[in-house]
Amino acid sequence: TEHVVRQALDNAVRPLLFINKIDRLIKELELNAKEIQERFKIIIGEFNKLIVNYAKAEFMKNWMVELSEDTVAFGSALHGWGATLSQYLEKQESFNHVMQVYDDAGDNRTKLEILREEFPVHDAILKMLADNAPNPIDAQSYRIPFIWSGPMNSDLGKALKTCDENGPTMLFASKVQVEHGQTIATARIFSGSITQGDEFLLISAGEKEKANNIGIFMGQRILAIESVTSGNIVAIKGLKNIKSGESMINSGYNGDAKGSLQFEQLN
């Protein structure tokens, strides 16, 4: 956990906390509700110490997490349930409900479906993100100086800091996978927009390629789409020279940003 949190903070990403494996606290360690509550306090305290130690000073106070603020969720990813405190208290008065479900289920995992139906883990994660994670415009206003090595006062630097969809198009490919012999790059659009058929310079590779097949992720599927604007995640199929960690800029860029324009290797 420390390694992951430190990576996030180094890249000026706000971390949120999901306390996983609650089932083990109940079934293996046989903790009661009060002991589980104390364990939560310890985990949250240790998490906040990491923020104090590694977060930039201007973010430290606002990025610390608390159960009462719904910046912490808890549950069991294995059994598919999770909740923030407010989500839990909307349906149950105490944690004894969860403990009773596990006691009644024994080794019969199908009886745990009641928790999955009552508190779907994806709802908890989505609520935490929607309520607490910054939107792309706000995030890029302070993140870009930490993750991009180009000049901030250039046209490109200004577009990146404001997530300007009308600025030069700049992307970062965080993941590249191969499916059925075809590469699929997952990229964040930091400025500008990408339209099917646009040509890009892959900065590290020094190659130009066209994005002839783009889409957005819908769960496990990729929905083909003609264009995507800054602040979004795009899937690009078929790039031959793309690798994870590549920075991409529209090949016709002729602005005033000079020198090294690639993003730092984002963890």
For the regions a language model picked out, list residue spans one by one.
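Structural and coupling elements of P-loop NTPases
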Residues: T1-N267
